[in-house]
Design a protein with these regions (language model features):
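Donor nucleotide-sugar binding loop of glycosyltransferases
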Residues: 13-16, 44, 104
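Hydrophobic helical membrane-anchoring modules
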Residues: 3-4, 15-23, 55, 183-236
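Short beta-strand/loop segment that forms part of the nucleotide-sugar
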Residues: 33-44, 64-66
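Short acidic donor-binding loop at the edge of a beta-strand
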Residues: 86-93
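A conserved acidic beta->alpha catalytic loop
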Residues: 41-50, 101-102
């Protein structure tokens, strides 16, 4: 059975992470999956804590502690770079997901099945339902439509995805991934497969979305496509 690396960025969300890890462990045991798990601690204010224990399905578990808070996108970029340089993770395709429970862990099974049957550079999980406030949904829709208007690209997914290990170099040789991981996928990889999954509620706590974070996210995404936007502006 092929071994996969699961990459989980986390900032203070240790309670939710622990519940997610328990579900991942159950899925691994049920399907006889083999996982390495890398948790990226984005300089949390609370001491990292988890009850997960290694077993025949969870072969390796590591917490990568960052010395300063980088935000989830840069934390993911740093972690992918770490995987690229560390021989323990060589040739292990990477499953990236958020740690708060909104990414449904049962979808991991669908990602792995598609990875076996379909040739892809990456498999992304498109959200079929968002549980954020109306104002967020409206502004996010505006963001997506403006992005499509200026670039011709649609991004209907977040971090939840499966990335082929051999395609890491395609992402790391440009700065896109440090701005926005989903946008970097669209801008640098050719064979992108898609599956759909309902976005769940957080296991506990309130959503951290706010206007500033949405604006910051939108700015990062647009920065990835700046050359396309520049060309569009000249000719249209």
């Amino acid at each position: 059975m092929k071994v996969y690396t699961i990459l989980l960025p986390v900032y203070n969300d240790w309670k939710n992470l622990d519940k997610l890890l328990s579900k991942i462990s159950y899925i691994a045991k049920k399907n006889n999956f083999k996982f390495y798990i890398l948790v990226v601690n984005d300089c949390s204010k609370f001491k990292p804590k988890t009850n997960l224990k290694k077993n025949k399905n969870i072969i390796k578990f590591k917490i990568l502690n960052l010395s300063q808070n980088m935000g989830s996108q840069r934390a993911i970029a740093l972690a992918i770079n770490h995987l690229k340089k560390n021989s323990d993770y060589k040739n292990k395709d990477i499953i990236i997901m958020d740690a708060d429970g909104q990414d449904d862990p049962s979808t991991i099974t669908d990602l792995i099945k598609m990875n076996i049957t379909k040739v892809s550079d990456a498999i992304v999980v498109e959200r079929t339902n968002r549980r954020e406030p109306f104002w967020f949904k409206f502004l996010y829709l505006v963001h997506k439509n403006v992005l499509f208007l200026f670039t011709g690209n649609q991004i209907r997914f977040g971090n939840f995805s499966l990335l082929k290990f051999k395609k890491i170099k395609n992402l790391m040789h440009k700065s896109d991934i440090w701005a926005a991981y989903p946008a970097a996928i669209v801008n640098n990889l050719n064979k992108i497969s898609r599956i759909k999954s309902e976005r769940k509620r957080r296991y506990s706590g309130n959503s951290k979305v706010n206007l500033y974070k949405l604006f910051n996210h939108s700015s990062r995404v647009f920065s990835v496509f700046k050359y396309k936007i520049f060309i569009f502006s000249i000719f249209y």
